[in-house]
Design a protein with these regions (language model features):
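Core nucleotide-handling region used for phosphoryl-transfer chemistry
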Residues: 1-155
């Protein structure tokens, strides 16, 4: 049985949420909070990828983290012993999603679709070492060759 749940989002009335249109094979809209004005309401917009026409959600990155003191202030009736807290792992989050419009898997980082770009956009040390794109690193993390087409990846 193949069932699917569809979510939509309406961020047009939320202040301090940036809307970025992105076109690859099809069009996407990426919703991100404004880092200078992040609030508890906008923190859920760390990176949401939607269909720009229907607002169907394709990818929803975990919301912005909060400090223990902020959490305790917001939820004073919850005891610390009921939760496990982990250290934040720094790095670029890569989100995998399925786009039913084109029947393909795709990846997104916070600000773009596809992963065909580098963490270091320029070479500062002059060695011009070859860099792997986020897409290539993602493929290698799954045990595939860096140039494998997503259509040939068992997900």
């Amino acid at each position: 049985m193949n069932s699917q749940i569809q979510f939509t989002v309406n961020a047009s009335s939320v202040q301090n949420v940036q809307h970025k249109n992105y076109t690859k094979e099809v069009s996407y809209e990426i919703l991100n909070y404004d880092p200078a004005n992040v609030t508890s309401d906008t923190g859920i917009y760390r990176s949401i990828v939607v269909n720009p026409d229907t607002k169907e959600v394709f990818s929803f990155a975990p919301p912005k983290s909060t400090t223990l003191s902020e959490f305790a202030e917001k939820f004073p009736c919850i005891e610390d012993s009921r939760f496990q807290m982990n250290e934040i792992i720094e790095g670029t989050m890569v989100n995998l999603f399925y786009d039913s419009r084109i029947s393909k898997w795709e990846i997104a980082t916070k600000g773009a679709i596809g992963g065909n770009y580098w963490y270091y956009r320029n070479s500062y040390d002059g060695d011009n070492k070859p860099q792997l794109t986020f897409r290539q690193m993602f493929l290698e993390s799954l045990g595939y060759d860096k140039n494998t087409d997503f259509a040939n990846v068992e997900l």
